Amino acid sequence: MSSQSHLLEKIKIHSFFYNPRDTERVLNIILSGKQIEERKKIEILKAYKRGIDQQYFQSYLLFDNEVKFISKITNFKVKNDTVIARFQNGFIGNFDPHQIADNPEDFYNLITSYMFVKIRKGVNGWYINDIYSIEPQNNYEIAKELFDLANQEHQTYALLLQSFGYDVQKMEIQDIFLYLPRLFPLFKSPITKRQINYVEISNRGTGKTTTFMILQEVFNFRYYTEPPTYANLVYDARNNMYGAVFLSNGLIFDEIQNWKDGFSSKELGAINATLSTGLENCVWTRGAGTESKSSTIQKCIPIIYAGNPYNMTINKLRNPDVEDYLVNYQIFTSAILDRIHIIQLAIKKTYDKIINARVLYPSILKALVDLIQQKINNTNNYVVCDNLESRRQEQSIDIQIILQALDIDLQIGQRSNEELCKQIYNFMRFSNLGD
């Protein structure tokens, strides 16, 4: 058996069929392939439904004095050494942070995971009786085995794509460069310390949403199909609770072609101003009058914008200018576009031609991404592109570092810097809408 076949077989053994319409997929996140009896599965699925479905959850509150649910914390604040949290089902309760962790580092890492929560009805209403994280620890043993196999064959890019359900064996070289950037926001440049921001405008049915769902459910990205409110995104002043940027590892804004129809330019402008500052300086303004003495919080997170192209433009005889084309969406300021590493305007193959839907179990997948990041951190060979200026030049370095860590040979030193930099820029601002 060849090394590549051995790698694919290993991935198959440690993966599951990911279907975003399958309500039972949470079992793979929580159990990571562990086999349990059917009765336990049913109990877990009901607890999960109570944790995400507000009406289903409320129906149990009407009849029981104790309710168990599985959910993530969507907002929280700390007051008098107690965590006050809002969950996906709308329930708000407080708990001692020692219930989920013994130290600050573990608390920080676990606060965004799926929680098992048991609440009881008391004299003064419902209260949290027990709470703890139920996600398994990252499986570095299996991840390292896969990583070493791919590294040996210089196929890290293939391992990454395969791990997210893409079928590299079906892909042509061009396809690899069209789909790989969807996963770049998982990584951080060791040179500029920036994470990768990405815009994709492509046809429907290419697997965008499926990939974004994995980023949401496994890597704790926050997924939006409409513009977020300031309270949801940054800070809820009414309830004095942290917003999405404080509890997520990234933001995904999908279906952006619909945004301008439902929101005023003033509303979009306010959100864009916040996003622009957050993208550049990792500074998110919380506003005055909050309980915290600090008016701003620093956190660096990547952002993905995605949507579908306008039909009137697809059939033009020439490719549109990439950034000019995005003016159609009325949500991108020049400041935001300046902070985007990669923009793709592309007609891509549909998912049936490039996806096998076999995704690594989350405990392995998260460990694999960590290992790839370590490889990125140890990559320091790049060229400075004199054809680019300022921020764009720094972004080109970030992309060179990540591509090389994924075993994409840029042939640095074997061809002219001018040729390489031109290719990198075309990768950063790509369009085939007029092809």
Spans of features found by a protein language model:
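Conserved AAA+/SF3 P-loop NTPase catalytic/coupling segment centered on the Walker-B
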Residues: 208, 247-275, 301, 311-318, ...
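P-loop NTPase catalytic core of nucleic-acid-dependent motor ATPases
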Residues: 136-219
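Phosphate-sensing "switch" segment of ASCE/P-loop ATPases
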Residues: 295-303, 308-410, 414
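Conserved catalytic/switch belt of AAA+ P-loop NTPases
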Residues: 265-297
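Extended, charged/polar low-complexity intrinsically disordered regions
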Residues: 1-164
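AAA+/P-loop NTPase substrate/partner-engagement loops
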Residues: 206, 217-264
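Short glycine-/polar-rich loops that comprise or flank the Walker A/P-loop
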Residues: 111-115, 195-196, 248, 299-301, ...
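C-terminal engagement/docking regions of AAA+ P-loop ATPases
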Residues: 418-435
